[in-house]
């Protein structure tokens, strides 16, 4: 009995040790969890930082490429400007040469490109009719027929004839054409009358009278 009484008080001590071991186990579990959480957080931070650096590294070539493209454009723009100036100069020289080839136009006349084209069309049509060839199309296209109303008489006194047939009579302005034709006929009749009068004065019969 005394031995049982002596061993009986040992039970509470064993329970306290068990509780203490359980507390240590729980503390160790909490520490492991906190370590795992810290590890996960560190991994997340490292991953986000790596992604950030990767995005910056990816965007850097784009910016460099954009700056390179802009730099290339700035280098090419003077060449484009030079080509455009050359094209405009060549076109202007061609129109000046075409205007110089047209008769009945004073050398220092200032005409627009449209005026030069209308005069050239009129002159070509006049030469075609003079050679007895038929025109491949209408002598005056519809867009040319109304130009006399868009271009009033300006720097050149003969400009009114520019849209009245230029060098010849056309159906662009019938009134001007009829007037010009009548003047030509009057000039021809006057020359014929003067020739007849001279022949009459120099004839022997007139001298005998």
UniProtKB/Swiss-Prot annotation:
Residues 72-85 have a biased composition (Basic and acidic residues). It is found in: Nucleus. Residues 1-20, 54-85 are annotated as: Disordered. One of its GO terms (biological process) is negative regulation of muscle cell differentiation. One of its GO terms (cellular component) is nucleus. Highly expressed in the uterus (predominantly in myometrium), ovary, and testis. Expression in the uterus is higher in the diestrus phase than in the estrus phase and reaches a maximum at 7.5 dpc. Expression declines towards the time of delivery and returns to the non-pregnant level 4 days after delivery. Low expression seen in lung, heart, intestine, and spleen. Its main location: nucleus. CDD domains: bHLH_TS_TCF23_OUT. Both the bHLH region and the C-terminal portion are essential for inhibitory function. This is Transcription factor 23. It comes from Mus musculus (Mouse). The gene is Tcf23.
């Amino acid at each position: 009995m005394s031995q049982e009484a002596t061993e009986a008080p040992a039970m509470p001590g064993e329970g306290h040790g068990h509780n203490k071991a359980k507390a240590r186990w729980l503390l160790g579990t909490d520490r492991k969890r906190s370590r795992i959480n810290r590890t996960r957080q560190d991994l997340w931070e490292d991953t986000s930082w790596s992604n950030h650096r990767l995005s910056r590294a990816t965007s850097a070539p784009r910016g460099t490429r954009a700056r390179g493209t802009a730099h290339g454009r700035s280098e090419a723009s003077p060449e484009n400007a030079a080509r455009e100036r050359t094209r405009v100069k060549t076109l202007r020289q061609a129109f000046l040469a075409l205007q110089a080839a047209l008769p009945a136009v004073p050398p220092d006349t200032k005409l627009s490109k449209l005026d030069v084209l209308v005069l050239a069309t009129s002159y070509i049509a006049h030469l075609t009719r003079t050679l007895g060839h038929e025109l491949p199309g209408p002598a005056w296209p519809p867009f040319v027929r109304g130009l006399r109303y868009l271009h009033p008489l300006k720097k050149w006194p003969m400009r009114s004839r520019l849209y009245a047939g230029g060098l010849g009579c056309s159906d662009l302005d019938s009134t001007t054409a009829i007037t010009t034709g009548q003047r030509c006929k009057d000039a021809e009749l006057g020359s014929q009358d003067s020739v007849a009068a001279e022949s009459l004065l120099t004839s022997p019969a007139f001298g005998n009278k």
